[in-house]
Design a protein with these regions (language model features):
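Conserved catalytic motifs of ABC-family nucleotide-binding domains
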Residues: 174
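Conserved ABC ATPase signature
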Residues: 112, 153-157
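Conserved ABC ATPase "signature" region
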Residues: 21-29, 120, 124, 131-149
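Catalytic Walker B motif of ABC-type/P-loop ATPase nucleotide-binding domains
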Residues: 178-182
Length: 330
């Protein structure tokens, strides 16, 4: 059974169109013009138990609206979603015991309480038995290394410490599904690595299903089993990182270092379709569609055109592919 099941999910918002000027304002007040905006359009997908799904898209793509429906904050206009067999909008008090939510830019911790006291309050909110609470705290202390600051007030924690503390708070009641929204935002490289290792360990040891939204594409590449990408509320890709690269990573780059004194020479490939030439000093970069051109032919021809000191092949990485999606180049 899928841990997350989404079928034909739709969310519409109605907004009032205001006309400019005093007359327009009066007209809008007396006879307001309404427009329907489709934030999420007919989304359908499933996430099996234990999978880490990267749920990504540009700003305004509909990610936050979808997450709010999955967590029960918003009610769908049509369609439905089930988390662990439960409809999020039905009996929310029972449903929230199955999920954990972390928002990178907002904390669920009490600012003036010591972190340990915060966890004690959450224990009562989620009705966690004493025996399970102590077991969970031991596990979370080990995975997230909370011991050094667990007695400190939350307001004194660094951003990295607070993020670890927030993740622990969301996992205290042992949820089956964890929603992570930008969990590494604003963190330095070493802290990001620690957070990623902790997420991976939690996923592997507890089979926690994780839905991750992030603009840090290193999070996607290092954590996710699968990518679900949306744009304007609609699905545009669903598959693994390797499938994304195979499908859209056809553009490759050959980088040549030329022997000096050849600025007057021109590449044989100047002006050809599906090929971009970038020439700066003694550096020559040829970006090409690998489904149309063979790298061996390009190397052979370029060796004929120029005297080459060095060359290397650069594959298109996931960051470049997704950036092209956002720019509508793919």
């Amino acid at each position: 059974m899928a841990m997350i099941e989404v079928q034909h999910l739709q969310k519409n918002f109605v907004k009032t169109v205001k006309e400019p000027g005093l007359k327009g304002a009066l007209r809008s007040f007396i006879h307001p013009e309404k427009q329907t905006f489709e934030a999420v359009k007919d989304l359908t997908f499933e996430v099996p138990k234990g999978q880490i799904l990267g749920f990504i898209g540009a700003n305004g793509a509909g990610k936050s609206t979808t997450i709010k429906m999955l967590t029960g904050i918003l009610k769908p206009t049509s369609g439905f979603c089930r988390i662990n067999g439960k409809i999020p909008q039905d009996n929310r008090q029972d449903y929230v015991k199955d999920i954990g939510v972390v928002f990178g830019q907002r904390t669920q911790l009490w600012w003036d309480l010591a972190l340990q006291e915060t966890y004690t309050v959450l224990k009562e909110i989620y009705d966690v038995p004493d025996s399970l609470f102590h077991k969970r705290m031991d596990f979370l202390n080990e995975v997230l290394d909370l011991k050094e600051f667990i007695k400190d007030p939350v307001r004194t924690l660094s951003l990295g410490q607070r993020m670890r503390a927030d993740i622990a708070a969301s996992l205290l009641h042992n949820p089956k599904v964890l929603f992570l929204d930008e969990p590494t935002i604003g963190l330095d490289v070493s802290v990001k690595d620690n957070i990623r290792r902790a997420i991976t360990q939690i996923n592997q040891e507890e089979e926690t299903t994780i839905l991750l939204t992030t603009h840090d594409l290193s999070d996607i590449e290092q954590l996710c089993d699968r990518i679900f990408m949306i744009d304007k509320g609609q699905e545009i890709f669903d598959g693994t990182v390797s499938q994304l690269k195979e499908t859209f990573g056809k553009m490759k780059t050959l980088s040549f270092e030329l022997v000096s004194g050849q600025s007057h020479l021109v590449s044989h490939y100047e002006g050809l379709p599906d090929m971009t030439i970038d020439r700066q000093g003694n550096s020559l970069n040829i970006e090409f569609d690998s489904s149309r051109y063979q790298s061996a032919d390009i190397i052979k021809q370029t060796l004929s055109d120029f005297e080459i000191r060095d060359l290397k092949m650069v594959d298109t990485d996931i960051e470049d592919i997704i950036r092209r999606f956002y720019r509508k180049e793919l």
